[in-house]
Design a protein with these regions (language model features):
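Generic secretory/membrane-interface signal
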Residues: 7-8, 31, 40, 116
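Glycine-rich loop-to-alpha-helix module at the N-terminal edge of alpha/beta enzyme cores
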Residues: 2, 14-15, 43-127
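Short, basic and Ser/Thr-rich N-terminal targeting/leader segments
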Residues: 20, 28-31, 103
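Short, compositionally biased leader-like segments
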Residues: 1-20
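Short, flexible, glycine/charge-rich loop motifs used to bind or transfer phosphoryl groups or to couple energy/partner
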Residues: 23-24, 97
Length: 128
């Protein structure tokens, strides 16, 4: 199911404050730092990179190449510490190689900043 680009703002404004940019992003045609408007094909230079969440740009070849893997692992809760899978083990192995310093032996994954702070406080209280 898909909504026609011409109807996007009308539909969104029924349930949300739809006061964002007038552009309707074409998720398939946007590329690098360019947002393509689905209605007319016009390209706009993205000067805010989705507020830093899109720092590598749109449809980066390495992300597109890994789309199947990303879709598959997105169905699994990455912070679940009781059920494991091989993709999670591969991620932790690579993360250990490039991001965990020798003086820290363990990692604790959460799904956001506020949850990270909350769990850091819980850990501090438990291990005081």
């Amino acid at each position: 199911m898909s909504v026609a680009a011409e109807k996007v703002r009308e539909i969104l404004s029924q349930n949300i404050l739809a006061d964002g940019f007038d552009t309707i992003q074409d998720l398939d045609k946007s590329h690098g730092s360019w947002i393509v408007d689905e209605r007319n094909g016009k390209e706009y230079l993205d000067m805010f990179s989705m507020f830093a969440s899109g720092a590598i740009g749109y449809n980066h070849p390495r992300i597109v190449e890994s789309q199947e893997l990303l879709g598959r692992v997105a169905l699994s809760k990455p912070t679940l510490s009781d059920i494991y899978n091989s993709d999670y083990a591969d991620f932790v192995r690579v993360f250990d190689e490039i991001a965990i310093p020798d003086y820290l032996k363990h990692a604790f994954f959460v799904e956001g900043g506020a949850l990270g702070v909350e769990n850091a406080l819980k850990t501090a209280f438990d291990w005081k």
